[in-house]
């Protein structure tokens, strides 16, 4: 059991960063800007959990300075110009510039030759990260001719639908009649010209009838009548008893014969009753 505990402690101490290493991350951009001197990148301060415990070793520092990558240890003046106008915690990203250039090239005429963005290489061959966002020529043409105004369904149907055949005068007159004629009021209105000649229909504003002098064309049934139809019936179902004191011998419960029924209908009814009897 003791050996297992000792091995655990030994592994924990071996895994601890006894020799702190240099941190080159984006969070140290402020220190990177402050430590630039004469176009040379100075070593950043050591960061680690045991900085206060371990004294500096000059031999190790010299070895670490010699073992630095040549591309990161020295920067040219052209590379330092990019860091000059930046705030802390910001690094140059050439991909954004190339993205803007790519969109501008896509909006230009596709017939013109497209020149790729030139990337300047520093003397120490430090290649910046360049992400090309160029659009192909087909997408550029599609964006250039993209329709701005789209036809709505009803507008498209109005444009593509064939014209309806010309309507007759009677149909036009029925369509032009307002809705309040259904309630009995017929205003004075002029009928459109008929094929047989110029005929004018003068309507009576009081009775809603038309004079007999109007001649309708052949095949058209007039819907206005001269005579006024009386819908009142003589025997409307209301019984008024007589006020005389003499008794009446009439049977009030007998059905009254409608005088409008013709004798032919009575004979036909009698024949059907005779045939129904056994």
From Swiss-Prot:
The lineage of its organism: Eukaryota, Metazoa, Chordata, Craniata, Vertebrata. O-glycosylated. Residues 97-123 are annotated as: Disordered. It comes from the Eukaryota. The gene is ODAM. GO terms for cellular component: cell periphery; cytoplasm; cytosol; extracellular space; mitotic spindle; nucleoplasm; nucleus; supramolecular fiber. GO terms for biological process: biomineral tissue development; inflammatory response; odontogenesis of dentin-containing tooth; positive regulation of epithelial cell proliferation involved in wound healing; positive regulation of gene expression; regulation of actin cytoskeleton organization. InterPro entries: Odam (IPR026802). Residues 107-123 have a biased composition (Low complexity). Residues 127-129 are annotated as: Interaction with ARHGEF5. Residues 1-15 form the signal peptide. PANTHER family: ODONTOGENIC AMELOBLAST-ASSOCIATED PROTEIN. Glycans are attached at residues 103, 115, 119, 168, 246, 249-250, 272. Keywords: Biomineralization, Cytoplasm, Glycoprotein, Nucleus, Secreted, Signal. It is found in: Secreted; Cytoplasm; Nucleus. Tooth-associated epithelia protein that probably plays a role in odontogenesis, the complex process that results in the initiation and generation of the tooth. May be incorporated in the enamel matrix at the end of mineralization process. Involved in the induction of RHOA activity via interaction with ARHGEF and expression of downstream factors such as ROCK. Plays a role in attachment of the junctional epithelium to the tooth surface. Interacts (via C-terminus) with ARHGEF5. Belongs to the ODAM family. Its main location: secreted. It comes from Canis lupus familiaris (Dog). Pfam families: ODAM (PF15424). The keyword Oxidoreductase does not apply. This is Odontogenic ameloblast-associated protein.
């Amino acid at each position: 059991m003791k050996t297992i505990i000792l091995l655990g402690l030994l592994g924990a101490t071996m895994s601890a960063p006894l020799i702190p290493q240099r941190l080159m991350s984006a969070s140290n951009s402020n220190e990177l800007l402050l430590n630039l001197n004469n176009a040379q990148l100075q070593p950043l301060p050591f960061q680690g959990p045991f900085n206060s415990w371990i004294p500096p070793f000059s031999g190790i520092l010299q070895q670490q300075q010699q073992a630095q990558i040549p591309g990161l240890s020295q920067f040219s003046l052209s590379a330092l110009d990019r860091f000059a106008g930046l705030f802390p915690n910001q690094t140059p990203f050439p991909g954004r510039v190339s993205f803007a250039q790519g969109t501008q090239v896509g909006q230009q005429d596709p017939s013109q030759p497209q020149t790729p963005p030139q990337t300047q290489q520093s003397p120490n061959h430090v290649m910046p990260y360049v992400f090309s966002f160029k659009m192909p020529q087909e997408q550029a043409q599609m964006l250039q001719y993209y329709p701005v105004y789209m036809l709505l369904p009803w507008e498209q149907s109005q444009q593509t639908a064939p014209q309806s055949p010309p309507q007759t005068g009677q149909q036009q007159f029925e369509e032009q009649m307002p809705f309040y004629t259904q309630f009995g009021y017929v205003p004075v209105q002029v009928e459109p010209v008929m094929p047989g000649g110029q005929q004018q229909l003068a309507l009576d504003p009081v009775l809603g009838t038309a004079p007999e002098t109007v001649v309708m064309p052949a095949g058209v049934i007039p819907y206005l009548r001269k005579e006024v139809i009386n819908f009142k019936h003589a025997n409307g179902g209301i019984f008024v008893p007589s006020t005389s004191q003499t008794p009446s011998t009439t049977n009030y419960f007998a059905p009254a014969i409608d005088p409008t029924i013709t004798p032919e209908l009575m004979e036909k009814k009698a024949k059907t009753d005779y045939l129904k009897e056994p």
